[in-house]
Amino acid sequence: FAESEGGETVMGTLRSTLEQILQVELDLTAAGRTDAGVHGWGQVITGRFPDHTDPARVQRSVNAMLAPAIAIRSAEWVADEFDARFSATSRAYRYDVWNAAVPNPLVARTAWHVVEPLDLDAMNAAATHLVGEHDFSSFCRRPQVPQGAPEKSMVRIMHRVDWHRVAVDGFSDPGVSALLRLEIAASSFCHQQVRSIVGTLVDVGRGRRAPDSMLDTISARDRAAAGPVAPPTGLVLWHVGYDGERWDADRRR
């Protein structure tokens, strides 16, 4: 999502399009710096815009130019001190897994295809150990810091981690659906934390780890103790919270 040298990104494309519309240079801030391949349904972005900017017009213009790959779902003025990233107090993600022998082309771009049958109860039993305040070093890719600088804390407060089945075409009963969804929310997340958690929980579902082994994985504070990093395809930044309140286009519903 975030801009980088020599690569096309969502933020870079959005910023250049907004600058083309408004004829000014812009500096934008996003609530989440998601990896390539991750979706951002509830991404929040702020920036300093000219006083004469009409949010509704900007939204229509951007959507006409960038849809369907990129779309603004809501646009409005906020207080000067509001910052999409630093004002956020919680973030929620979803991760979808298509758990069936046969692939589903309809969800191929938004779900990880796992062939082996997964034990959903075992995955949820393991997930309960993640809730609360923990050092999540085992699930995080540590950022590089200058020599002599202190390491950044990997302590986070996890509010919710649970799996459930989602109704999808071909399965009239959600209880037998092959589409599994993880709902996960925390004060904030470190780099690759959600995908590392997903990979570890899927290992539990495959029977490669016991549910209670999650306690040892957390206490190890070692990336090697966790499972593989799940593919980015199934991950969605679902919504961002500010002072306990959800702030996105869906909050008005």
Task: Please report, for each region that a protein language model flagged, where it lies by residue.
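Structured-RNA-binding interfaces characteristic of tRNA pseudouridine synthases
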Residues: 1-253
